[in-house]
């Protein structure tokens, strides 16, 4: 329960910082480890790190479902999956040891298997994000497996 309270507190702090920046019209640069800073346009604004929002929330190997936070190192997720003989089928590229799950999803980069298995976006069942106004928005959600397949 303490981990959940900590995550809720961190999310509230991020939301408040984003609301304040929106009110002041201060640009923010959302970042995890910064491993993809070279990718795309040059980033500007005050850094807002998601690194503290880290950890694997839940993992059901038999259900093939894992819930992780944005700041979770990609290597940590892959090691957890490998311990159960599983992997990320879309083979996300690593741009440094600190690459995070949030960066993987935000950049949408997939490896050579993308053509046959799909991209990272095809494996995301749901997410919660904070928009530019500091509001927490849920998309998708938890799924439960029944005998016919997956249902919300």
Question: Predicted regions span which residues?
Answer:
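FAD-binding subdomain of flavoenzyme oxidoreductases
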Residues: 97-152
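Active-site-proximal helix-loop elements at catalytic-domain edges
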Residues: 1-5, 64-69, 116-126
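Glycine-rich N-terminal segment of FAD-binding domains in flavoprotein oxidoreductases
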Residues: 5-95
């Amino acid at each position: 329960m303490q981990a959940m309270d900590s995550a809720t507190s961190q999310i509230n702090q991020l939301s408040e910082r984003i609301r304040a920046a929106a009110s002041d019209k201060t640009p923010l640069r959302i970042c995890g480890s910064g491993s993809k800073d070279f990718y795309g346009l040059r980033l500007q604004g005050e850094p807002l790190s998601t690194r503290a929002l880290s950890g694997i929330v839940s993992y059901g190997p038999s259900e093939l479902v894992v819930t992780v936070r944005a700041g979770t190192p990609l290597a940590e997720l892959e090691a957890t999956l490998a311990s159960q003989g599983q992997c990320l089928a879309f083979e996300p590229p690593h741009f440094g040891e600190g690459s995070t799950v949030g960066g993987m999803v935000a950049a949408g980069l997939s490896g050579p298997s993308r053509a046959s298995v799909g991209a990272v976006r095809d494996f995301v069942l749901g997410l919660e994000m904070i928009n530019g106004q500091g509001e927490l928005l849920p998309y998708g959600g938890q799924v439960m497996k029944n005998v016919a397949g997956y249902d919300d």
